[in-house]
Each structure stands twice: as structure tokens, then as C-alpha cells.
């Protein structure tokens, strides 16, 4: 039983991180209807900014996380203004190519600044908690609490605030929202900023139990795409549920089958679920 609960803990940890990254990706897709491949680079940038603030400037963990969130929010907003907004009326292929260009540029910039080596981010929470025979590192408990707290905050923001309602309206019908006076440019910038914050927080939470390096966003963004396809493109509940499904599947698959197949499980689930429900678990649309 303890081993089973240990995998539940690991699944919640992975699922929380995957869901945060997928939420930012699905929000942007809901507004632009274009897969933002640069989102993986925003994740990587968040980890490097937090790492730099802690290692070079001596900032504590939470200040580094806040600094990374602000920096990546600004970076994502800048990318929206300079890259995605001018291509708003272009065919779907052009924004996709532009997003890949942003991804490659940011990875090259990170490698030029911090090098291609792997870096370890220290965590102030190195303790271990024993819960009913389950070994629970404090950092993993922090990831679970912070990730689900942030998901709840995003849900309340989208459902209970006027600004959040404008994001939902823009995702459902951009032309109609513009006709009733919603500023499309402002909503797009805000959505990119939120996606940047989610990516940076996810990276800063996960980096202490992983490694920081320029290509760290590749596998994460690939799985995030699997998640939003599983959950339904543009669906916020789908991103959360899909992230948890992939997190639990990887955790239990690695333990009961083999760690060699851990990363393949997500793609196997994608094929299985889409063969049964091609539209994904939830229907399209941010809500």
C-alpha cells in the first residue's frame, strides 16, 4: 500500500507540473488558435532566470520564483507584440514557424549566457516527511500545493472576474468580442503574460528535483501538447485532467513496467484516447 501511495504522490507531482504548463499553452491556443511551440522556451527561461537570481544574486527561492514569473511574463508579452500579433491574419503555418523561431532563438540565447551544461537549482526545502509509510520530500509536497493552488486561482480568475471573462469571450468568438468593445490586443497580451507566469512557476517548482539546461523545455512542451490534445484543444478543465492523467500514467508505468518506457506512455495514451474520443476528453474552448 505504501508503494502505491508513493506512486500517487509522484503522479500528483508530475501531473501538477504538466497541468501548469498545459494551461498556459491551452490559454494561448484558445485566443490565437495556433499551437505556441515557444511555450517550452518560456518554461526553460523561467528556470534559468530563477537559477540566476539564486546563484548570482543570492535571492531566496520565493523571490527568485516571483522574479522569474515577472521576467517570463514580460518576455511572453514581448513575443506576442513583436512576433504573433503581426501574423494574426496570416495562415496558420506562419505563426507556427514564427513560434519555432522564438523557441530556437531563446534556447540559443540561454546557451550563450549560461552555457550548455546542466545546472542544479538548490531548494530551501530539503526535508523529508513520512506520511503513512510514504516518503514525501517537502519539495514535492510544495509542488503539489502550489500547482493546485495556482490552478484554483486561475479558475476563479477566469470565472469570477471581468478580465477573466474577456479572455473566455475572446476565445469563444474573437470578432464578436471585439464588436462589443473588448480590446483584442489587451486580452492577447494578458493571455501571453499569464501563460508566461504559469510556465515560469512550473519550471521553478520542478527545477530543484530536476536539472536546468537549454533544451529542458523540449520534452515538457511535447507532453503539454499531448495533454491539450487529450483534454480538448483550448479547454482549461481538459488541460488539468489531461495533465493528471499523464502524470499518474507515467508514475505508475515507470514503477510497474519500466522507467525506460515512461516517456512513451503519454503518446500511447494519446493514441488510445483519441481512437475512442477524437475530440478529446472535453470539447474545445476555454471555459
Please describe what each predicted stretch is.
Residues 47-51, 69-75, 102-110, 146-155, ...:
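Hydrophobic core segments of alpha-helical transmembrane domains in multi-pass membrane transport
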Residues 82, 113, 172-179, 183-186, ...:
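Cytosolic-side transmembrane-helix boundaries in multi-pass membrane proteins
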Residues 58-102, 109, 241-246, 277-278:
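Alpha-helical transmembrane segments within multi-pass membrane transporters and channels
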Residues 86-160, 187-190, 252, 257, ...:
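Transmembrane helix-bundle core of multi-pass membrane transporters
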Residues 14, 135-212, 236-242:
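Helix-loop-helix "hairpin" substructures at the membrane interface of multi-pass membrane proteins
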Residues 18, 58-70, 189-199, 203-270:
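Transmembrane alpha-helical segments in multi-pass inner-membrane proteins
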Residues 1-21, 49, 56, 60-64, ...:
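Membrane-interfacial amphipathic/re-entrant helices at transmembrane-helix boundaries
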Residues 28-78, 82:
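Membrane-embedded helix boundary and interhelical linker motif in transport proteins
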Amino acid at each position: 500500500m505504501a508503494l502505491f501511495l508513493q506512486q500517487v504522490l509522484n503522479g500528483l507531482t508530475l501531473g501538477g507540473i504538466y497541468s501548469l504548463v498545459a494551461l498556459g499553452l491551452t490559454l494561448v491556443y484558445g485566443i490565437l488558435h495556433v499551437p505556441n511551440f515557444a511555450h517550452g522556451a518560456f518554461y526553460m527561461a523561467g528556470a534559468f532566470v530563477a537559477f540566476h537570481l539564486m546563484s548570482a544574486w543570492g535571492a531566496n527561492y520565493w523571490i527568485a520564483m516571483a522574479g522569474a514569473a515577472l521576467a517570463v511574463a514580460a518576455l511572453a508579452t514581448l513575443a506576442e507584440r513583436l512576433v504573433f500579433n503581426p501574423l494574426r491574419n496570416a495562415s496558420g503555418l506562419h505563426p507556427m514557424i514564427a513560434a519555432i523561431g522564438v523557441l530556437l532563438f531563446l534556447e540559443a540565447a540561454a546557451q550563450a549566457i549560461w552555457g550548455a551544461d546542466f545546472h542544479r537549482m538548490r531548494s530551501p526545502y530539503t526535508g523529508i516527511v513520512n506520511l503513512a509509510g510514504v516518503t514525501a520530500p517537502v519539495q514535492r509536497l510544495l509542488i503539489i500545493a502550489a500547482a493546485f493552488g495556482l490552478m484554483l486561482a486561475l479558475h476563479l480568475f477566469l470565472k469570477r472576474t471581468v478580465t477573466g471573462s474577456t479572455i473566455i469571450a475572446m476565445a469563444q468568438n474573437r470578432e464578436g468580442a471585439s464588436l462589443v468593445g473588448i480590446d483584442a490586443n489587451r486580452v492577447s497580451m494578458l493571455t501571453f503574460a499569464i501563460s508566461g507566469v504559469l510556465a515560469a512557476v512550473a519550471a521553478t517548482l520542478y527545477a530543484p528535483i530536476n536539472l536546468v539546461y537549454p533544451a529542458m523545455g523540449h520534452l515538457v512542451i511535447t507532453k503539454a501538447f499531448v495533454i491539450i490534445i487529450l483534454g480538448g484543444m483550448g479547454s482549461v478543465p481538459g488541460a488539468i485532467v489531461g495533465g493528471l492523467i499523464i502524470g499518474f500514467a507515467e508514475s505508475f508505468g515507470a514503477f510497474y513496467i519500466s522507467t525506460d518506457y515512461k516517456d512513451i506512455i503519454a503518446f500511447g495514451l494519446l493514441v488510445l484516447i483519441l481512437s475512442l474520443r477524437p475530440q478529446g476528453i472535453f470539447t474545445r474552448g476555454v471555459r
